[in-house]
Amino acid sequence: MPLKHYLLLLVGCQAWALGLAYYGCPSECTCSRASQVECTGARIVAMPTPLPWNAMSLQVVNTHITELPENLFLNISALIALKMEKNELSTIMPGAFRNLGSLRYLSLANNKLRMLPIRVFQDVNNLESLLLSNNQLVQIQPAQFSQFSNLRELQLHGNNLESIPEEAFDHLVGLTKLNLGRNSFTHLSPRLFQHLGNLQVLRLHENRLSDIPMGTFDALGNLQELALQENQIGTLSPGLFHNNRNLQRLYLSNNHISQLPPGIFMQLPQLNKLTLFGNSLRELSPGVFGPMPNLRELWLYNNHITSLADNTFSHLNQLQVLILSHNQLTYISPGAFNGLTNLRELSLHTNALQDLDSNVFRSLANLQNISLQSNRLRQLPGSIFANVNGLTTIQLQNNNLENLPLGIFDHLVNLCELRLYDNPWRCDSDILPLHNWLLLNRARLGTDTLPVCSSPANVRGQSLVIININFPGPSVQGPETPEVPSYPDTPSYPDTTSVSSTTEITSAVDDYTDLTTIEATDDRNTWGMTEAQSGLAIAAIVIGIIALACSLAACICCCCCKKRSQAVLMQMKAPNEC
């Protein structure tokens, strides 16, 4: 073979080897044509090599890598995103990220990092997102993030940080999202956030904060979300949020707040969600929640509130969800809900209410769902739902109700779900109107549990819906008459027991004739019935068909309303708190 052929073969082999070095994919990884490399698996204990020189995205997940040595990524300078999560990583050497000047996204979350070298990020000045969450970090150096003028997102939640130097964020002027939740902070410096004028999301949840100094959030004029839930905050300074006029979501739940200072929420015109559940609030002063014209959700459950005064929520005319369950409410003033003209859902369950004023819900013209279960309600005014024509769900189970007023639900044409079980219903003559209404509207009771009679003793435990309620009329002595088949009373909402009994007795006496006369005239139809009996049978059949049609219509209404209700609730209800 000529010498030039040997030379060509040698050059070709070298080029092939060089191509592998630049374009090859490590056996432990998968590489796509879109310059994406993914390396996963417990068998990986060191960074796989060689990595393709044109890689733009590298993911190293669920490996046993413990260390990133110096100059590890020198040959992949085009890298834009590096994700190293859920590894055993505990050490990063200075210079590990050298030559990654194009990197925009770096995630080191869910590792075992305890300390970070002071200049570990000096070669990635163009980072926009840095995720260090769910490690074991105990300290942040004052100049740790000093070179990140382009950083937009910093995630430090889920570490063991007890404090942060007050100058740690001074150079992060472009930061829009900062998560410091689930650490062990006990205090914050008033100047910690003073250079973060572009910050939109600040999360400090699940720490040990007991007090927040006045002025801590004054520089955060663009803040939209502030998460302070699950701390140990006992008091709030009156002007704590006065400079946060763009705030939309404020989470204060599960703290130790016992009172709300007057004017605490006065300067929050954009707020649409406020959570205060799981605190120690005992009273709500009228006007404390206003004006907040954009507030849609107010969560106040699991407090110690005992009463609601007139106009407590009068400045919240766009409120759609009000949750007051699991308190100690014994009294609600008739004007407590004034101004809540757009309220859709009202939760008052698990309180100590015994009575409600007939006008208490009169201003809630758009209410759709109301939960009153697990109180001590003994009775309800007949007009309590008079102005709430759009109700689709009413929960009254687990109270002390023995009866309900005539016609209390008649105008609620959209009612789909009514819960009445676990009440001590008294099934005497007074219950017949409710019994008849339930017969015609059984589909609205659902299929889980039906209301059951508690008294008298002879009907205890029987369903209020299907029980056969018979009340004897006055006895009339007369000659023995032929036995006439009995038919169920016609289900009708008005109580007509006395009328029907008298009519039946009078008819039986007036129409009495000798049996021989009946047999002689043979005035019976094909089924062996008299004309009167045939009329009763036909009437019973017609009424049965009408009742079946009403039940079917109620079922269709219920299905349609449930879909509408779920759609509304899906639009109102927000994700879980961060």
From Swiss-Prot:
Cytoplasmic topological domain residue ranges: 557-578
Membrane-related topology note: Single-pass type I membrane protein
Compartmental location: Cell membrane
Family annotation (SUPFAM superfamilies): L domain-like
Segments of this protein annotated with the region Disordered: 476-500
Gene Ontology CC terms, in alphabetical order: apical plasma membrane; cell surface; plasma membrane
Hydrolase is among the record's keywords: no
Domain called LRRNT: residue spans: 22-53
Protein name: Leucine-rich repeat-containing protein 15
Species, as recorded: Rattus norvegicus
Gene (name only): Lrrc15
